[in-house]
From Swiss-Prot:
Pfam families: PsaA_PsaB
Gene that this sequence comes from: psaB
Protein name in UniProt: Photosystem I P700 chlorophyll a apoprotein A2
GO BP term (any one): photosynthesis
Function: PsaA and PsaB bind P700, the primary electron donor of photosystem I (PSI), as well as the electron acceptors A0, A1 and FX. PSI is a plastocyanin/cytochrome c6-ferredoxin oxidoreductase, converting photonic excitation into a charge separation, which transfers an electron from the donor P700 chlorophyll pair to the spectroscopically characterized acceptors A0, A1, FX, FA and FB in turn. Oxidized P700 is reduced on the lumenal side of the thylakoid membrane by plastocyanin or cytochrome c6.
Amino acid sequence: MATKFPKFSQDLAQDPTTRRIWYGIATAHDFETHDGMTEENLYQKIFASHFGHIAIIFLWTSGTLFHVAWQGNFEQWIKDPLNIRPIAHAIWDPHFGEGAVNAFTQAGASNPVNIAYSGVYHWFYTIGMTTNQELYSGAVFLLVLASLFLFAGWLHLQPKFRPSLAWFKNAESRLNHHLAGLFGVSSLAWAGHLVHVAIPEARGQHVGWDNFLSTPPHPAGLMPFFTGNWGVYAADPDTAGHIFGTSEGAGTAILTFLGGFHPQTESLWLTDIAHHHLAIAVIFIIAGHMYRTNWGIGHSIKEILNAHKGPLTGAGHTNLYDTINNSLHFQLGLALASLGVITSLVAQHMYSLPSYAFIAQDHTTQAALYTHHQYIAGFLMVGAFAHGAIFFVRDYDPVANKDNVLARMLEHKEALISHLSWVSLFLGFHTLGLYVHNDVVVAFGTPEKQILIEPVFAQWIQATSGKALYGFDVLLSNPDSIASTTGAAWLPGWLDAINSGTNSLFLTIGPGDFLVHHAIALGLHTTALILIKGALDARGSKLMPDKKDFGYSFPCDGPGRGGTCDISAWDAFYLAMFWMLNTLGWLTFYWHWKHLGVWSGNVAQFNENSTYLMGWFRDYLWANSAQLINGYNPYGVNNLSVWAWMFLFGHLVWATGFMFLISWRGYWQELIETIVWAHERTPLANLVRWKDKPVALSIVQARLVGLAHFTVGYVLTYAAFLIASTAGKFG
């Protein structure tokens, strides 16, 4: 007899009910709880899975390169990137009627195609790719790499090639290698690629495998480098009249500090980007020699942490080294939090300081990339707190951490939680109060009675960075200050860029921005409150001091202790997910509506209508969904119909979530038993039999299913709205 799923848990495999399948899926990646798992084996399994993860990423990118080369219009797009829309891939659908075939035969294609809103065309072009052949070569190269990584993953699971536990616990060596190798050398390699391939291509000089060794990127060669005359590499940059991809107006500089944007592409100067990566390479290669390893030189993180006792912090950072180094959940929490912050920063910088040629003028792509990265940041941040809470339940040792900063966080958690609660209440009541007041007075025909607050502090900060519009005359916006004269010498293009009014750098802000900023602050603080409370109360609370004994997720502690439902760390994570999505809604609505005004040259629409609730509902959501709702109708379809369909489908998935979120165990148990009863009495259907006794989802499982539907539906609905409303206006 074959062993039943899951193989990793004999206990579950012998469960006679459908719980076996659900719990099997739920714990498949919870390696710590698997039968016979040792600490060493745990680390080895996770390590091997990283190779698989990287292989999947390479495979995915290879697929993008391949489909663009095979079915895209890359070579045509390069000739006119502002007017030709990039094609992602062809669509083959047997359900298409003639109307749909015609609607989706777009962007100069001879058959139905999808338009690319990912920005990959701009990226390929910027880094020096100009032909389909180069894209194919890249796709094959990544396929080979993916195979190599899959093999490496398999190899590191073989007994002879499994790293030891001591190797995994050697944090200093790992940090040195990751800092110097992963960040330092890869940044150096990227700077090298930009200097040797991308910059010459941008100046109309092709560099390929056939000539890259014989084509020096700078006429002076390496002589200035070895003689210390490095300024030569910054002399003679591209002129303002440079036509990207040609030698017209091109200079010879390779490492510059120009600031601002290339006038034609509206993206950062490639020579500035190369300089940036070279600087990062130098810093990180030095940083990668910082920590003490086998040679006894450099810093010991353990010694630093144990010695570091700041004022009012008790035992300070004592024993934190071992606490972190012995807890994978702590490490994962830190990694997710860092990556979450970086991903959000990427979203903010991709539109304000676009680095890829012509991407700033592809408005739909800009909107899609901003929203995409902010959503990913939201999921990563919630995951960080989830694993922080699991750390407190599974890995935290109160004795080892006595009176250090971690223990003190737990000891004064009431102060933290109550302050966050106060901030959230303050923000919520005041922001909603202002919106509601404004909404009422506008509804009664007296818009002049709105309470409109100018964000003077934020405007002052913009002025310090050089925005002259507000007349603050401070630092960079004061032409006579030291900051301005220094800036003119070191970043000559910056002030032009910040004051141009046609890009997204330091957008002009007013009362509408002030209100929505505080709405977003409310969302962020409430999400943080729920997550921080969930993590700090994960071991126990006044209501349930022994909570840690019940694990990370439990529905309730039975009828004898009333009030213990919904207080596990899992429940906090579950609730925070809704707040996280809610916050992202406000954030992306704001960004999108603000930019629709900037792009269409009509900023007044946002400024006048974003100060009251009906303005948001009517002038952002309703007005921009008109084209979407008309994607298909009795008279035919247009090329937005796929988004219209996705918009409807997203709503359906989202609404399905509530069926699981609002009804619980009893309903499902009755429903399942009724369905089983009907099956067993229906001809043909009764030939199919369950081997497991069907039981309803547990409360936690039903919440997970509901949350998954809510989340997927929410994302699908807004993605369709965002892309269709922007593409409908700007193509």
